[in-house]
Amino acid sequence: MAVGKNKRISKGKKGGKKKAADPFAKKDWYDIKAPSVFEVRNVGKTLVSRTQGTKIASEGLKHRVFEISLADLQADEDQAYRKIRLRAEDVQGRNVLTNFWGMDFTTDKLRSLVRKWQTLIEAHVDVKTTDNYTLRLFCIAFTKKRVNQNKKTCYAQSSQIRQIRRKMREIMTNMATSCDLKELVKKFIPESIGREIEKATSSIYPLQNVYIRKVKILKAPKFDLGKLMEVHGDYSEDVGTKLERPADEPVAEGVTEVIGA
């Protein structure tokens, strides 16, 4: 019988088992700050890898998009069906300053609106605000029974649908092009555009559940820190007080204390 190495017997690895590194050890938490149009300003936290060499942490945070329920932003559970998108525009200290970047409805809310015996009317339009944001607004509406109507159905005719759609586009364009993005977001929250459409189209056919169901930002202007600070209103970061000193004023030379001398 030949004597030799038994290859089946496994050798122990050199150095033993490697200790698993904690993935959070090299990351930092940053606070997400919502614009001043919302009631709740501190909306959450986000993680980012620490600055290492040329890879700067703040650059990794910029243009990150957060989706938050309007119920959390307004502290109002009745607004839970709206989802607001906020985009990180600037980082100051440990705070991420965001701006509005779109809006959508939850799927369950949209499904609950669609019912039998009524007509669904949709319209969308591209608008440009006074501060050069290009948005696409999507509107949804449903017909309802007229006063004292006995008939079960409330279907609108094709000509009426076209008229209503034209009116929707007209109102959305007028209300969006006459204000900046901050003012427009203020109109989205209480659904003032939907109410205006409902009022204007009542002579054509009575409508119910009129909503701006979706907002997409197609084009944003060049980043301006001054405009962002206006959006955040009362936000202030803890910074040192600037000292004014004349150029010709001599600087007093004090004695430098050496620690451990």
Curated annotation (Swiss-Prot):
Intracellular or extracellular location(s): Cytoplasm
Cellular component terms (Gene Ontology): cytosolic small ribosomal subunit
InterPro entries on file: Ribosomal_eS1, Ribosomal_eS1_CS, Ribosomal_eS1_euk
Biased composition (Basic residues): 1-18
Main location: cytoplasm
Molecular-function annotations in GO: structural constituent of ribosome
Keywords assigned: Cytoplasm, Ribonucleoprotein, Ribosomal protein
GO BP: translation
Region of interest (Disordered), residue spans: 1-20
Family membership: Belongs to the eukaryotic ribosomal protein eS1 family.
Subunit-level organization: Component of the small ribosomal subunit. Mature ribosomes consist of a small (40S) and a large (60S) subunit. The 40S subunit contains about 33 different proteins and 1 molecule of RNA (18S). The 60S subunit contains about 49 different proteins and 3 molecules of RNA (25S, 5.8S and 5S).
Protein name per the record: Small ribosomal subunit protein eS1z
Organism the protein comes from: Vitis vinifera
